[in-house]
Structure formats: structure tokens, C-alpha cells
Amino acid sequence: MMLSIIGSFATSPAEAAPSNYKFDFGNGQVEKGYIGVSADEKYDEKKRYGFNTPENMINVPASGTGVGSDAVEFLKFSTKSENTFNVDLPKGLYEVKVTLGDTARASVAAEGVYQVINMTGNNATDSFQIPVTDGQLNLLITEGKVGTRFTLSALEIDKLSHHPETNRTIYIGGDSTVCNYYPIDSSIQAGWGQLLPKFVDSEIFQVRNMASGGQIARGFLYDGQMEAILKYIKPGDYYILQLGINDTNPKNTTTEAQFKEYMREMVQQVKAKGATPILSTPQGRATDFNTEGVHSSVNRWYRNSVIALAQEENVPLVDLNVLSSAYFTSIGPAATLALYMNGDTLHPNRAGATELARIVAEELKRQGLDGFTGEEKKNQ
């Protein structure tokens, strides 16, 4: 078995741990440069890594190649589960890259909160920054979609800084028109939060998109996504929040007054952390054109309550509903429809999500918020 451990060593046990790792999970062939980890490998202080409760892990095949050809499955899970993969790490800020096995939809949790929401598809890959302050990273794969497998094929850990604090961050809350789709760099369907990094100065900000499909304000507030944001958000960070599409669905039994108060609670929680909340109104449907060729959807998605809340709480507002309608009117019905998924007038495709992200970034730049660019970065 080949090991790849790169790191600096210090005198204390915690600081003696390597600060860079590459793990290949499962019982198949171990890829060159990776540490092979089987499901039955219990955490060991000498190795400094392993599963906390290997009796709740199994090895499983995966349909990919290389590190994606096998995986481990987490039989017990939740953000608070103790069924974690543990790695000793010196205090600092780390970049963690996760590759799933065969999974319909799964999330990544670490340090007791969500880190990545709803990765989809076999061998989906994503990464995140995480501060480690207690000498150990504790990570697992969790829901996701109930009744499906939660698997992990590979994990790469790289130390970014000795200081355990995330870079300035733009956090995003939202629904299926905002969230990430996978493969994240080439998905046909996309949310505008997924494409926003193209219009953000990466030397100033990282973007953490915590949006998820089907989400409502009550769910985002109480089901773990807001908890994850509040764990890390700090002065200098932004929190862009766009919800309302699913809240207006009768099956979710959310009145407009309730929606507004859930949104207010999130705004106030972010303010209390010293960060800047930003509200956004959802764009309309592709077909919201009148007979004169004007696109308008101002009465959709509890928009008026979002505008009123922004005024009451004195926070920035992106009226994406109106701004996107102006853009759609300028390009016409046919070109607008081409920015949405085939047969779907609600969800943007990658080109549509890119245009919505551009509109959001341009408006925030116009309002004087730093970190937003007016031009798309082609290398992202």
C-alpha cells in the first residue's frame, strides 16, 4: 500500500500530525499516491486516522474508475452522528475535496454540521474550506435522499493556513433555482448560486452555496443549513438569501406572514454575527410574457414581502425578479425559453443560471458591495 503524507512536524502530539492527506476508500486497488482505507479500519492514534465506529461501515463497489471504482458506505448517519471518519490535523484552515461513490443524492457533514448539500450522481466531487481547532477532522456522508446509499470514494485534505478561520465568504441560501448541480463544472441544469463564482473576485471571497432543491424558508432555518452557516459566518462575510418559490406551494402550508418572519429570523441571526445579509427576489417563469412581449412576474413568490423585509431590516436587496424580467424582455420570448431546461419553464439551464448570476453580481457591484465583478471569468 502506498502512502502519501505531506506535512510539517512539531513537538506536541497534535502538531506532529501531517497536514495533507489523500485517502482512497474501499477494499479495491489503491491508487498511486493515496492511502488505502477499508471500512473495518478503526481510528488509531498511531496512524492518526480511521473510522470512529467501523461496525457501522461497509465496503461497496462503485461504477467509476481509479479512486471512484470502490467506496465505503455509512450505515448510520446524520450531521450529529458519531459514525465519522476521523483524521488528526494540526490547528489551521483546510481545503477538503470529497469524491462520492455511487450515490443518488448525499450531503457531506463535518464538525457536526453540513458542509456540502445534496451532491448528486455517481462519483460527484466537491470541495470546501473548514477550520480545524481541536486537532481532529470528523467527517461523514449523510442525507441526502432518504433510502439511498451514502458513500465515500476519496478524500483529499490540504492545509491552507495556520489560522483556523475561513477566508471571506459569500454564503447562499435558496432553492432549486439557486443550488448546485453535478458535475459542478459541467452540469446541464444549474442554479445561479452555482455560477456566481464566475462573477466574484476569488482573491477576496470564496462562495459557499448551501441552497437545496425544494427548500422553503422554514426548512432552511430549522433543518441544518442555517446552522452550518451560523457556525462559520463572521464580519466581512455576505449571506445572500432567495426563497419563496416553494413557500407559495399550498402543500407547504406557509402563509406569507410566516414566510416573512422566517426570513426575518435568518436576517437577524446573520446581523448578530456581524455579517451582511442580502435578500433577493426569485426570477419568474420563462413564459411570463404578455401579448406585447413584456416579461413580468412581480406578483409571484411572495416578492412584496421580501422587498418590505429588506426595507424594514435595512439590508441590501437584489430585485432579481424585476431585473431578470427586464433582461428577458430585451432578448424576447424565444431566447428566454432557451435559457431554461427543456420542457421546464421554472428551472434555468447552465446558460440561464449564468445570466442570472451575472445580474445578481452586477446589481451588488452597483450598490457598492465589494468582491463582485462585472465580467464573467472564463476559467471557472
Give names to the regions the model predicted.
Residues 110-112, 203, 273, 313:
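Short, structured coil segments at secondary-structure junctions
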Residues 17-183:
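Compositionally biased, intrinsically disordered or flexible polar/acidic segments
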Residues 145-161, 359-380:
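A recurrent domain-boundary module in secreted/ectodomain proteins
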Residues 25, 139, 158-211, 226-239:
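Serine-esterase "nucleophile elbow" of acetyl-processing enzymes
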Residues 5-18:
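Sec-dependent signal peptide cleavage junction
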Residues 215-224:
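Structural motif
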Residues 22, 207-209, 314-317:
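Conserved beta-strand scaffold positions in the cores of enzyme catalytic domains, especially
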Residues 225-350, 354, 358-369, 373-376:
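Alpha-helical cap/lid subdomain in secreted, periplasmic
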